[in-house]
């Protein structure tokens, strides 16, 4: 077996389904040499049963659905699958990701050229087509962490001294040695992982990828950034502005410092805990301000932002739009008839909040290329799966009963 892919799921079954579909649309790789483990952490949306129905073992013998009786966390769930994996390479993959048809081919081909590879990551793209800065990160040492918390990395993003957290001084289009690989897409070899060890289960939800990446570096390996694109919705499993996220993330960083920078423990403990409190207060203020804004300026009577569907299954999409009360315009097209995608529109793409591409008529690679070549912050990627009858956007999921 060449590759074992591990996906940890918690209440995002439709994203897992879409992710699995993108895996099986991969080109340039032998799908019979790929096994997939989906570890369900006691989801409340009936994920395990749903996925087993959509991907029956008779048709997908290499997809294994593992179920836990409680939410054991990200690291422990991954470790459960690692023990069952048979692949030469192991890929840790978030459920809210979408692979292009060439993502796996590109990353596996690149491993042949990488020297002493520990872990490798890819160029992650947000749903508006912009580059996700967490695709490349430096080790969050006390200095690097201070620069981030103090905002110095934002003031001097290209500086190797102040801007190392996101390493924006590196090209996004070149293979580069980096420090930290995002757990959203993290490829390693089974051999290297055996030497370094699995995920530290002390971490529950955040920080595991930072810890594992750092352990590879300390063991003498090199970590790499590979500029092949991947869509990462990010935020569907968690809400980044919530108190819970802020608290759990910074607590994870405190665990990281205690583990790897023991001699700084006393000095770092207070500022990190202070950061937790300050960021939590900021998150609460932002949340309450947004709620107040919605209360004072209700959307009643205001025309909702429109969506655009591009594909050949408009009749089915119209049924979904009617059921959910969506405002959708329709353009019958495919890659051949519309080679520039939504950039061919006579009106500005910013007229729409979502541009929904039918993945039966357009490849994922085509869709990401169109959004990446000219991102609009207010215009988001949407996908429609005609076979399943599901529209997936960054904020909502709509499906035909």
How would you label these PLM feature ranges?
Residues 90:
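Short aromatic/hydrophobic "clamp" motif used to bind/position activated sugar donors
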Residues 7, 12-27, 320-321, 342-343:
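Short, well-formed alpha-helical segments that are part of the catalytic scaffolds
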Residues 65-85, 106:
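Glycine-rich, basic loop-to-helix element that forms the pyrophosphate-binding segment
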Residues 22, 40-49, 70:
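A conserved acidic beta->alpha catalytic loop
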Residues 214-290:
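Active-site-adjacent helix/loop segment of glycosyltransferases
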Residues 21-33, 324, 373-374:
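Short, acidic, metal-binding catalytic loop of nucleotide-sugar glycosyltransferases
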Residues 98-134:
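Conserved donor NDP-sugar-binding/catalytic core segment of glycosyltransferases
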Residues 139-178:
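Short, flexible, basic/aromatic active-site loop/helix in glycosyltransferases
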């Amino acid at each position: 077996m060449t590759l074992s892919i591990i996906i940890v799921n918690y209440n995002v079954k439709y994203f897992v389904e879409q992710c699995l579909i993108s895996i099986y649309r991969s080109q340039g790789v032998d799908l019979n040499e790929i096994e997939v483990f989906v570890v369900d952490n006691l989801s409340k949306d009936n994920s395990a049963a749903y996925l087993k129905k959509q991907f029956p073992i008779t048709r997908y013998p290499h997809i294994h659905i593992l179920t836990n009786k409680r939410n054991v966390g990200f690291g422990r769930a991954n470790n459960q699958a690692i023990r069952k994996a048979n692949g030469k390479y192991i890929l840790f993959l978030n459920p809210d990701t979408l692979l292009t048809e060439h993502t796996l081919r590109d990353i596996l081909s690149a491993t042949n050229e990488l020297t002493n590879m520990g872990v490798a990551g890819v160029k992650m793209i947000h749903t508006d087509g912009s580059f996700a800065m967490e695709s490349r990160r430096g080790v969050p040492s006390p200095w690097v962490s201070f620069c981030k918390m103090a905002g110095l990395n934002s003031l001097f993003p290209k500086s190797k001294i102040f801007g190392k957290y996101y390493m924006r001084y590196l090209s996004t289009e070149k293979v580069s040695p980096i420090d930290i690989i995002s757990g959203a897409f993290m490829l390693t070899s089974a051999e290297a992982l055996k030497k370094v060890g699995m995920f530290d289960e002390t971490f529950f939800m955040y920080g595991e990828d930072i810890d594992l990446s750092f352990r590879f570096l300390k063991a003498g390996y090199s970590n790499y950034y590979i500029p092949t694109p991947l869509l990462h919705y990010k935020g569907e499993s968690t809400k980044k502005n919530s108190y819970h996220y802020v608290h759990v993330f910074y607590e994870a960083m405190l665990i990281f410092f205690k583990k790897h920078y023991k001699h700084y423990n006393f000095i770092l403990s207070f500022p990190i805990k202070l950061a937790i409190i300050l960021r939590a207060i900021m998150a609460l203020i932002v949340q309450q301000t947004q709620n107040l804004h919605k209360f004072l300026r209700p959307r009643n009577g205001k025309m909702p932002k429109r969506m655009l569907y591009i594909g050949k299954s408009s009749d089915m999409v119209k049924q979904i739009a009617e059921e959910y009360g969506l405002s959708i315009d329709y353009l019958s097209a495919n890659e051949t008839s519309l080679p520039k995608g939504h950039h061919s529109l006579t009106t500005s793409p910013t007229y729409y909040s979502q541009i929904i591409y039918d993945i039966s008529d357009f490849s994922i690679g085509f869709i990401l290329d169109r959004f990446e070549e000219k991102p609009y912050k207010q215009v988001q990627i949407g996908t429609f799966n005609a076979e399943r009858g599901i529209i997936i956007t960054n904020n909502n999921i709509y499906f035909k009963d």
